[in-house]
Regions:
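PLP-dependent amino-acid enzyme catalytic core
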Residues: 1-215
Length: 215
C-alpha cells in the first residue's frame, strides 16, 4: 500500500483483524521514509518540516503519520500506559522512540513489511507497467507496486492499492512515457471553469461561523 498518513494500511490492518484473509500488509513509502525505517529497525523518528522532502508522489510527503499511533496501540497489546510513554514522554523528550526485543518482533508477527521508492524508481515502474500491461498508473501507485513486488513470494497474488488518477500528475507521467495521460471526460476544460473560494483568517471561530452561515 502506498503510505503517507498510515490511513489506508491501518484500515487494512483492522480489516485483517476482523477476518479478511491477508497474508502480509506491505507499507510503501517514498523518500519520506519514517515508516519504512520503523518497520525495518523499530526506530520511529518523525521529521521536522525542513527535513520532509518534496517528491513526485506528494500525498506521501508526510513525516508524522496521524494514524500510526492506532496501529502501535494494537501492536503492543492495547497497552495504553505504554503508548502514553512512547508517544508522550519519550517522543517529547527525545523526538523518537525505539522498539526492541519482543516488542520489535511483534511487527513481523503482525504480518507487516515495508520498503521505499525513489523518483527514478517511480518513473521506471510507470514506464514498465505501461509497456507490459498497457496501463497508466500514478506515482503513488507506482511506489506501492515497486515495493510490493519486492516482498511478493513466488506464485502469491499481489494486490496494490491505486490511490489517484494519473491525470493529476501529468508532468511525471510525461517524464515516464513521453506524453501526458488521457483525461477523463469530466475533467476536460476544468481549468477554464469559474473558481470559487473564500479566504479566512487562521481562527477556528471564524471557520465555525463560516460553516454555520454557508452549510
Amino acid at each position: 500500500m502506498p503510505t503517507g498518513n498510515f490511513g489506508n494500511i491501518c484500515a487494512g490492518h483492522i480489516a485483517r483483524m476482523m477476518g479478511l484473509p491477508i497474508d502480509r500488509l506491505v507499507c510503501a513509502t517514498n523518500e519520506n521514509d519514517v515508516l519504512d525505517e520503523f518497520f525495518r529497525s523499530g526506530s520511529y523518528r518523525p521529521r521536522a518540516s525542513a527535513e520532509t522532502h518534496e517528491t513526485s508522489s506528494p500525498s506521501m510527503d508526510i513525516s508524522k503519520a496521524s494514524n500510526f499511533e492506532r496501529f502501535v496501540f494494537d501492536l503492543l497489546g492495547r497497552d495504553g500506559a505504554r503508548i502514553r510513554q512512547l508517544f508522550g514522554a519519550e517522543l517529547a523528550a527525545r523526538g523518537s522512540f525505539t522498539l526492541t526485543g519482543e516488542e520489535f518482533a511483534r511487527i513481523a508477527e503482525h504480518g507487516f513489511a515495508s520498503g521505499k521508492s525513489s523518483h527514478a524508481e517511480r518513473v521506471a515502474t510507470i514506464r514498465d507497467t505501461a509497456k507490459r500491461f498497457d496501463l497508466v498508473i500514478d506515482p503513488h501507485t507506482a511506489d506501492g507496486l515497486k515495493v510490493g513486488r519486492e516482498h511478493r513470494p513466488s506464485g502469491q497474488p499481489l494486490l496494490v492499492l491505486e490511490t489517484a488518477l494519473p491525470t493529476k500528475f501529468a508532468a511525471t507521467i510525461h517524464e515516464a512515457l513521453g506524453h501526458e495521460p488521457a483525461r477523463p471526460p469530466g475533467l476536460d476544460g476544468i481549468e477554464q471553469l469559474p473558481k470559487r473560494f473564500s479566504v479566512l483568517p487562521a481562527d477556528v471561530n471564524a471557520v465555525k461561523r463560516y460553516l454555520q452561515a454557508h452549510v
